Structure formats: structure tokens, C-alpha cells
């Protein structure tokens, strides 16, 4: 069963949901002969610029890939610095996000984070839960395969408990168990830093998402670059497996209804 988010449409000027891999912090710092953590701090400022842009344009959901399940394998000093930066950012930014009407969520496996950080994450979610201007989802210790496996495990547990029959499992049911299930699927995916892959990010959710890649390093990402992405997106035709003629016919039917 197709979800409403998968009806063929011409791209709107402003996507409802933008997902971003924020790549290039380390290279930005290295080019300046600075420690990598300096790049991550500069990247935090780019996050604020992106939130500002989304609020101004009326984007309803923004999902940021902050820390992958594979990133735990990075050098320990970098992981430790990232955890401190993450903790300080939560302490510093949540009150401002609350004031601006931003709802904060986290997706991913929290069990590997230290207790103080888990507590801050839960506190940020509680304090902003009623906000509705923008849903900011932060993927932390997240992996797309892990996400799908967790959803499959939950369905298997329901079958084993007799709450569900195997023949009832379809794409829509699995979609309801993965992360971000209550949000529209991302309309636009952006990756900064020059690499052209999705790196285990939202594998299920990105099935029909428009992909946009830029050489811009994340700390240099600003409203101008984001507007370029939106301009490109607005010129695309989202067919969801159909033909352009079918989309034109559906548009005619909708306008005459």
C-alpha cells in the first residue's frame, strides 16, 4: 500500500522534509591546520544556519546525520571530543530551539552513549515535544541497516507473540516501525563534502527521495548553498516509478476534480 507521500508530483519549491549528511568538518579543519574538533565546532554553527533557513522557508522537518553507528570506530580522542561537543550543544541550544518552536528528536541506538548524555537527549525531547514549527531529528549512533533490522525484529516479536500474522506484513507495516515513521519521507537529501553516496543513512526512508550533492564542506554550508539545492529540487519531476505522461494525466484529473 503506497503512502500519501509517494503520490507522483512535480516538486514543490520548498520540500516538506530535508535530510542532510553533514560531511567535511575534519577536512575543513585540516585545510586550516587546525584540530578536527575545531571543524566540528564550526559545523555546529552551520547547523544553526540551516535551522534558520528551514524556519524561514517553512520546511516542516529537518533530519541531520550527526554520528553514525560506524563512527564509534574513529580515533578515541575524536569520539570523546564529539561527545563533549554534543553535550555542550544540548546544554547551550535547547532553550533557544524551544523558544523558536523547534521540536527536537533523536534517532539511533542510545545505549552506547554515557548516561549524562542520554539524560540530556531525553530532556531535550521532553522540553520541546509540543513544538510544531520544525521537527529537528538528529541521527546519533544511527545506521540505516540497523534501523531496518530493528523494525524487522519488532515485527518478528509481534508474530511470535501472536499479535500479528506473517501474511499481514507489507511495506506499509514495515514503514510504520522504522525511524521517522510519523513524518513524511524525506523529499530532498543533501550531502556536503563531495562524496556521492548515502553511507547507510535512512536506507528505507530515502527510496524515492531526490538526491543532491555538493563539494561544499559542511562548515561552509549556508543559505546560499541550501537555496541552490532547493532551486535544483524545484525543477525536478518526481515520478515514483511512473512516466511523465501518467503524471501529467494525474495532474489534469486533479485540476478538473
From Swiss-Prot:
Pfam families: Prenyltransf. GO terms for cellular component: cytosol. It catalyses: 8 isopentenyl diphosphate + (2E,6E)-farnesyl diphosphate = di-trans,octa-cis-undecaprenyl diphosphate + 8 diphosphate. SUPFAM superfamilies: Undecaprenyl diphosphate synthase. Keywords: Cell shape, Cell wall biogenesis/degradation, Magnesium, Metal-binding, Peptidoglycan synthesis, Transferase. PROSITE patterns: UPP_SYNTHASE. The keyword Transferase applies. This is Ditrans,polycis-undecaprenyl-diphosphate synthase ((2E,6E)-farnesyl-diphosphate specific). It comes from Xanthomonas axonopodis pv. citri (strain 306). The lineage of its organism: Bacteria, Pseudomonadati, Pseudomonadota, Gammaproteobacteria, Lysobacterales.
Amino acid at each position: 500500500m503506497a503512502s500519501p507521500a509517494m503520490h507522483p508530483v512535480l516538486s514543490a519549491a520548498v520540500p516538506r522534509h530535508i535530510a542532510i549528511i553533514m560531511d567535511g568538518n575534519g577536512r575543513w579543519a585540516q585545510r586550516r591546520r587546525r584540530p578536527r574538533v575545531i571543524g566540528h565546532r564550526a559545523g555546529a554553527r552551520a547547523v544553526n544556519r540551516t535551522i534558520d533557513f528551514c524556519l524561514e522557508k517553512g520546511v516542516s522537518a529537518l533530519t541531520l546525520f550527526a554520528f553514525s553507528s560506524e563512527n564509534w570506530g574513529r580515533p578515541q580522542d575524536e569520539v570523546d571530543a564529539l561527545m563533549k561537543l554534543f553535550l555542550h550543544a544540548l546544554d547551550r541550544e535547547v532553550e533557544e530551539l524551544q523558544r523558536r518552536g523547534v521540536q527536537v528528536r533523536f534517532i539511533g541506538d542510545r545505549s552506547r552513549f554515557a548516561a549524562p548524555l542520554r539524560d540530556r537527549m531525553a530532556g531535550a525531547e521532553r522540553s520541546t515535544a509540543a513544538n510544531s514549527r520544525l521537527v529537528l531529528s538528529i541521527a546519533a549512533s544511527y545506521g540505516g541497516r540497523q534501523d531496518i533490522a530493528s523494525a524487522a525484529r519488532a515485527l518478528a516479536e509481534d508474530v511470535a507473540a501472536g499479535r500479528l500474522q506473517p501474511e499481514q506484513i507489507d511495506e506499509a507495516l514495515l514503514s510504520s516501525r522504522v525511524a521517522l515513521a510519523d513524518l513524511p519521507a524525506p523529499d530532498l537529501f543533501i550531502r556536503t563534502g563531495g562524496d556521492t553516496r548515502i553511507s547507510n543513512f535512512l536506507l528505507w526512508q530515502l527510496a524515492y527521495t531526490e538526491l543532491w550533492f555538493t563539494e561544499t564542506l559542511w562548515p561552509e554550508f549556508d543559505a546560499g548553498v541550501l537555496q541552490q539545492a532547493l532551486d535544483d529540487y524545484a525543477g525536478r519531476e518526481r515520478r515514483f516509478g511512473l512516466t511523465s505522461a501518467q503524471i501529467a494525466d494525474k495532474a489534469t484529473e486533479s485540476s478538473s476534480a
